[in-house]
Amino acid sequence: MDSIISAASVIAAGLAVGLAAIGPGIGQGSAAANAVEGIARQPEVEGKIRGTLLLSLAFMESLTIYGLVVALSLLFANPYTG
């Protein structure tokens, strides 16, 4: 039974990292594209746009880090194994 739980944990860890990276990856690409477009339209507010972009990218990246934490806990601190 432990081998089934271990195999399921590895699969779940891979899915956790993969799925946790899809959403923020799409969001970061969209945010960067819109920031570049905004800077091209109004170059005088580049500093404000860049600061807001970096802050929002950090928040989006935290979602991926949460997925990594879940994956690492499934691999190394799995509560379901005996």
From Swiss-Prot:
The keyword Nucleus does not apply. Keywords: ATP synthesis, CF(0), Chloroplast, Hydrogen ion transport, Ion transport, Lipid-binding, Membrane, Plastid, Thylakoid, Transmembrane, Transmembrane helix, Transport. It is a multi-pass membrane protein. One of its GO terms (cellular component) is proton-transporting ATP synthase complex. InterPro entries: ATP_synth_csu_bac/chlpt, ATP_synth_F0_csu, ATP_synth_F0_csu_DDCD_BS, ATP_synth_F0_csu_sf, ATPase_proteolipid_c-like_dom, F/V-ATP_Csub_sf. The chain crosses the membrane at residues 4-24, 57-77. It is found in: Plastid, Chloroplast thylakoid membrane. The keyword Transmembrane applies. Signal peptide: none annotated. One of its GO terms (molecular function) is lipid binding. The record marks E61 as: Reversibly protonated during proton transport. Pfam families: ATP-synt_C. F-type ATPases have 2 components, F(1) - the catalytic core - and F(0) - the membrane proton channel. F(1) has five subunits: alpha(3), beta(3), gamma(1), delta(1), epsilon(1). F(0) has four main subunits: a(1), b(1), b'(1) and c(10-14). The alpha and beta chains form an alternating ring which encloses part of the gamma chain. F(1) is attached to F(0) by a central stalk formed by the gamma and epsilon chains, while a peripheral stalk is formed by the delta, b and b' chains. Belongs to the ATPase C chain family. F(1)F(0) ATP synthase produces ATP from ADP in the presence of a proton or sodium gradient. F-type ATPases consist of two structural domains, F(1) containing the extramembraneous catalytic core and F(0) containing the membrane proton channel, linked together by a central stalk and a peripheral stalk. During catalysis, ATP synthesis in the catalytic domain of F(1) is coupled via a rotary mechanism of the central stalk subunits to proton translocation. In plastids the F-type ATPase is also known as CF(1)CF(0). PANTHER family: ATP SYNTHASE LIPID-BINDING PROTEIN, MITOCHONDRIAL, ATPASE PROTEIN 9. This is ATP synthase subunit c, chloroplastic. It comes from Antithamnion sp.
